[in-house]
């Protein structure tokens, strides 16, 4: 297994170009199964999960090529089962189910894998498809969906806000007969991006970005060209990297309006931030950040995917900060690892109390999930001495060339190939 060796401390400064959003690219790739004509998707990040998704689409019979953009022709799809060997590594594969049953009347997906963060069940996906008229069976570790004729539009009130289930229902409803209304829908920018992609193909969707999405079903979707929005979590991660190292950064190909809650907290921490149409700059003027209180919640509140990075920020900030996690359970697995580097923190229920210290010390630490692992790499950049981050396959699932981008900012980081 590969590791990162990071030598610190360094002040990170310079420019970074932000990649396309993983959390938009994945649902968009699966939504391409709905299209009867070729689709070109631009700004798709080069990530393990993206490669797995493309491989899965190929196994279903789609023609998939990558030459800068990703080209998908799903006109010849003739396999309707997403097998365990691919699905086990990635939760996003559940997104194949809605398009398959909507367009072909049948679909099977093995129960998914991915990061082990708390209870992330597929119940809401299943309930939503059932309300659209699909028959669902759970057999031999597979979710099997089928429908006679077309799915039927429905008024769906979601029990809780779920990005994944909103995507599944919205995709399936595009080809349903009649109108579907999703109440208590997720409002994330990646939901908006997926909806806008579907509209490019001929879907009729309104209300994306609000908690009420209306989809008027159409008989078929055509092809089109679409550009994935910039990754707000990658952007936030690099902004935090500069903030904790008392540095200065310019993020290009960013989308500032997707990061309001994060930018507000960085300003509270003492960062000088400016934004343009497609860029964000942060300057700490050599100062140590101030501790901030953060509470995660669905968009437009503070994103859970930035929680680990802000936990780290608080652990090296002036003062004491409280981080409360309301979205996922069991999402403080990075805290014991950061404690190995000298961090002072206590976990009380769903809150971590961070007591800021001046400097961390290098140590051997282990990545446990995608965002937690990013916080450990950043910690290594500012810690005294050498930090070894193990199990970095988690990082490769969500960050494109993170070591190259950090190196360009002055970090002393190298990938050590595993046995």
UniProtKB/Swiss-Prot annotation:
UDP-N-acetyl-alpha-D-glucosamine binds at residues 91, 120-124, 160-163, 305, 327. GO terms for molecular function: UDP-N-acetylglucosamine 1-carboxyvinyltransferase activity. It is found in: Cytoplasm. Cell wall formation. Adds enolpyruvyl to UDP-N-acetylglucosamine. The active site is at residue 115. This is UDP-N-acetylglucosamine 1-carboxyvinyltransferase. Pfam families: EPSP_synthase. Phosphoenolpyruvate binds at residues 22-23. Belongs to the EPSP synthase family. MurA subfamily. Pathway: Cell wall biogenesis; peptidoglycan biosynthesis. HAMAP family: MurA (MF_00111). The keyword Transferase applies. The modification 2-(S-cysteinyl)pyruvic acid O-phosphothioketal is found at residue 115. InterPro entries: Enolpyruvate_Tfrase_dom, Enolpyruvate_Tfrase_sf, MurA_subfamily, RNA3'P_cycl/enolpyr_Trfase_a/b, UDP_GlcNAc_COvinyl_MurA. It comes from the Bacteria. The lineage of its organism: Bacteria, Pseudomonadati, Pseudomonadota, Gammaproteobacteria, Enterobacterales. One of its GO terms (biological process) is UDP-N-acetylgalactosamine biosynthetic process.
């Amino acid at each position: 297994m590969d590791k990162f060796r990071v030598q610190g401390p360094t002040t990170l400064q310079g420019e970074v170009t932000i990649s396309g959003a993983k959390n938009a690219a994945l649902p968009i790739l699966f939504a391409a199964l709905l299209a009867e004509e070729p689709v070109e998707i631009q700004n798709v990040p080069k990530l393990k999960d993206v490669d797995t998704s493309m491989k899965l689409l190929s196994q279903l019979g789609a023609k998939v090529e990558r030459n800068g953009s990703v080209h998908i022709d799903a006109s010849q799809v003739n396999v309707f089962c997403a097998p365990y060997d691919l699905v086990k590594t990635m939760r996003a594969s559940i997104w194949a189910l809605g398009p398959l049953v909507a367009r072909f009347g049948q679909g099977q997906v093995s129960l998914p894998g991915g990061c082990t963060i708390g209870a992330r069940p597929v119940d809401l996906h299943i309930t939503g498809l059932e309300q659209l008229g699909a028959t669902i069976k759970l057999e031999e570790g597979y979710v099997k969906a089928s429908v006679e004729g077309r799915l039927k539009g429905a008024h769906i009130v979601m029990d809780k806000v779920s990005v994944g289930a909103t995507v599944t229902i919205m995709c399936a409803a595009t080809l349903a007969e009649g109108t579907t209304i999703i109440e208590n829908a997720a409002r994330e920018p990646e939901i908006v991006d997926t909806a806008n992609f579907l509209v490019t193909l001929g879907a009729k969707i309104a209300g994306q970005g609000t908690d009420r999405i209306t989809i008027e079903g159409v008989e078929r979707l055509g092809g089109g060209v679409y550009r994935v929005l910039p990754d707000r979590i990658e952007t936030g991660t690099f902004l935090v990297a500069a903030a904790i190292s008392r540095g200065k950064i310019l993020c290009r190909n960013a989308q500032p309006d997707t990061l309001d809650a994060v930018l507000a907290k960085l300003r509270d921490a003492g960062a000088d931030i400016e934004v343009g149409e497609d860029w964000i700059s942060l300057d700490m003027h050599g100062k140590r950040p101030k501790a901030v209180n953060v509470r995660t919640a669905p968009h437009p509140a503070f994103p859970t995917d930035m929680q680990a990075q802000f936990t780290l920020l608080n652990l090296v900030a002036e003062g004491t900060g409280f981080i409360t996690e309301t979205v996922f359970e069991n999402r403080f697995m990075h805290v014991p690892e950061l404690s190995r580097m000298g961090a002072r923190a206590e976990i009380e229920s769903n809150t971590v109390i961070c007591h800021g210290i001046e400097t961390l010390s290098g140590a051997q630490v282990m990545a446990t999930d995608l965002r937690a692992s990013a916080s450990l790499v950043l910690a290594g950049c500012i810690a005294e001495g050498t930090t070894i981050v193990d199990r970095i396959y988690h990082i490769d699932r969500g960050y494109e060339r993170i070591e190259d981008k950090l190196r360009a900012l002055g970090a002393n980081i190298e990938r050590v190939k595993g046995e």
